[in-house]
């Protein structure tokens, strides 16, 4: 799917949500799908967009040797688990100082995405855990795929919904 096709698709999805009554999005956590962020801000201009931290970490660890993975992951965790954005910035600087000789693309990516990585710092720690990752929706989608894969067909919409206890 090209960037333009992705944007069109997400624009249609979000327009349908708005037409069905979703008048406002407060914050949206995205995983970097092409066109998604632009579609969100087009339909919901006041929405904050948060880049998924889990996806940032996974993408960062692609550069890392197996031997260094635990240490690099721990240093990245210090960034997103910081109490304040200022503390997170300091942890990112420490990360760069420690790892840039071996893994400069990691800190470069975090610096480039910083404005999209940090919106969740405006919220209390209890809320941050919910909004900094797309894991909740990915888990739901996985459950839906599993049920659909085993059943393949449903006699009615109600029968399908009953599978999900809705």
Question: Where would I find each of the regions flagged by the language model?
Answer:
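RNase H-like nuclease fold core
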Residues: 1-30, 34, 38-46, 136
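A generic short alpha-helical patch detector that favors 3-5-residue windows
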Residues: 2-6, 28, 49-52, 64-68, ...
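A detector of single, family-specific signature residues
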Residues: 4, 10, 18-19, 41, ...
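Generic detector of short, locally flexible boundary/turn motifs and exposed helical patches
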Residues: 14-19, 73, 105-108, 126
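Short coil/turn residues that cap or connect secondary-structure elements
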Residues: 21, 25, 32, 44, ...
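Conserved beta-strand -> loop -> alpha-helix junction used to position metal-binding or nucleic-acid-contacting
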Residues: 27-34, 39-75
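Acidic/histidine-rich catalytic cores and adjacent linkers
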Residues: 78-166
């Amino acid at each position: 799917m090209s960037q333009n096709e992705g944007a069109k698709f997400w624009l249609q999805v979000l327009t349908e949500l708005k037409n069905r009554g979703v008048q406002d999005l407060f914050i949206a956590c995205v995983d970097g799908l092409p066109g998604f962020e632009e579609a969100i801000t087009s339909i919901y201009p006041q929405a904050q967009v948060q880049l998924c931290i889990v996806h940032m970490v996974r993408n960062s660890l692609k550069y890392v040797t197996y031997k260094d993975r635990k240490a690099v992951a721990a240093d990245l965790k210090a960034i997103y688990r910081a109490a304040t954005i200022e503390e997170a910035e300091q942890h990112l600087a420490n990360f760069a100082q420690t790892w840039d000789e071996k893994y400069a693309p990691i800190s470069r990516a975090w610096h480039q995405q910083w404005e999209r990585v940090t919106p969740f710092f405006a919220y209390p720690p209890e809320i941050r855990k919910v909004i900094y990752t797309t894991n909740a929706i990915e888990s739901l989608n996985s459950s839906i795929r599993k049920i659909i894969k085993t059943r393949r067909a449903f006699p009615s919409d109600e029968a399908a919904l009953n599978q999900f206890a809705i």
